[in-house]
Curated annotation (Swiss-Prot):
It is found in: Secreted. Binds 2 calcium ions per subunit. Ca(2+) 1 binds at D71, V74, G76, D78, S80. Keywords: Calcium, Disulfide bond, Glycoprotein, Heme, Hydrogen peroxide, Iron, Metal-binding, Oxidoreductase, Peroxidase, Pyrrolidone carboxylic acid, Secreted, Signal. InterPro entries: Haem_peroxidase, Haem_peroxidase_sf, Peroxidase_pln, Peroxidases_AS, Peroxidases_heam-ligand_BS, Secretory_peroxidase. The record marks R66 as: Transition state stabilizer. This is Peroxidase N. Substrate binds at P163. The active site is at H70 (proton acceptor). Removal of H(2)O(2), oxidation of toxic reductants, biosynthesis and degradation of lignin, suberization, auxin catabolism, response to environmental stresses such as wounding, pathogen attack and oxidative stress. These functions might be dependent on each isozyme/isoform in each plant tissue. It is an enzyme of class 1 (oxidoreductase). SUPFAM superfamilies: Heme-dependent peroxidases.
Length: 327
């Protein structure tokens, strides 16, 4: 059979049949229709609230994707990243004063609870919000399998081991492999850096003294380097931000990969996908392919999001009333 796609208003809609053929199996306890009777308006409620959030701050789309990523990489997609407390994942080094969007999830949860009290998990709400953030920014849409439970504990130590923008490519690939994701997932999910912002603290090491020899990262395009040195001077405010993709700051597209071919990746972990020695036999060809075909990127990104969203720890857990605390 032929796979089918529809292009609608700039969005790519991949059919369920196509996704089933292209992506690895979703965990058995997850189903797109699990709330069809218990919360029939769930999808519309979440999308409406995400629209409101993006209208208030367009950057929130990228923030919700990142929040979902940081959740799924620690104990699976169980909304543990949303929990408050002394061992909160929010306080882990990669997350503190960095990961954002918690208030948006609170607002969505309140709207869902008003319609369907005690039915829908925070983990499912976060997964749907991430999907809608992509779609509403011009990216692909896909059916989200639902039925995740909310975790009962946070894991700050594991959150401290999230993939870092300062790590070499082999370390990043290994961390993805440790949770069951492959090299294609590394590149496709990195494509989420096609929108959003990054703080100077996350890339200023590339601008002046990258190797300890007093020189910048040689893979960084010179005009971009000069601009970034102005934005993030030595001794400057590390909390200032720069767009991850200057070509289309708030749009979900394949410009991120085109940037990498020109040495315009903002983070070291972005540019090494194309420019590092290890990339030659691992990630470089995918970067080149995605730069040529937005459809191919959208297809693989969708599959990677489905795989990542299927990282769950069995059926244990609960449906939290408040996403910040266990019941």
């Amino acid at each position: 059979m032929k796979t089918q796609t529809k292009v609608m208003g700039g969005h790519v809609l991949l059919t369920v049949f196509t996704l089933c053929m292209l992506c690895s199996a979703v965990r058995a306890q997850l189903s797109p229709d699990i709330y069809a009777k218990s919360c029939p308006n769930l999808l519309q409620i979440v999308r409406d609230q995400v629209k409101i959030a993006l209208k208030a701050e367009i950057r929130m789309a990228a923030s919700l994707i990142r929040l979902h990523f940081h959740d799924c990489f620690v104990n699976g997609c169980d909304a543990s990243v949303l929990l408050d407390g002394t061992n909160s994942e929010k306080l882990a080094i990669p997350n503190v004063n960095s990961v954002r969007g918690f208030e948006v999830i609170d607002t969505i949860k309140a709207a869902v609870e008003n319609a369907c009290p005690g039915v829908v998990s925070c983990a499912d709400i976060l997964t749907l919000a991430a999907r809608d953030s992509v779609y509403l920014s011009g990216g692909p849409q896909w059916r989200v399998a639902l039925g995740r439970k909310d975790g009962l504990v946070a894991n700050q130590s594991s959150a401290n081991n999230l993939p870092s923008p300062f790590e070499p490519l082999d370390a990043i690939i290994a961390k993805f492999a440790a949770v069951g994701l492959n090299v294609t997932d590394v590149v496709a999910l990195s494509g989420a850096h096609t929108f959003g912002q990054a703080k100077c603290d996350l890339f200023s090491n590339r601008l002046f003294n990258f190797t300890g020899a007093g020189t910048p990262d040689s893979t960084l395009e010179t005009t971009l380097l000069s601009d970034l040195q102005t934005v993030c001077p030595i001794g400057g405010n590390g909390n200032k931000t720069a767009p991850l993709d200057r070509n289309s700051t708030d749009a979900f597209d394949n410009n991120y990969f085109k940037n990498l071919l020109e040495g315009k990746g903002l983070l070291s972990s972005d540019q090494i996908l194309f420019s590092s020695d290890l990339a030659v036999n691992t990630t470089k060809r995918l970067v080149e392919a995605y730069s040529r075909s937005q459809y191919l990127f959208f297809r693989d990104f969708t599959c990677s999001m489905i795989r990542m969203g299927s990282l769950v720890n069995g059926a244990s857990g609960e449906v939290r009333t408040n996403c910040r605390v266990i019941n």
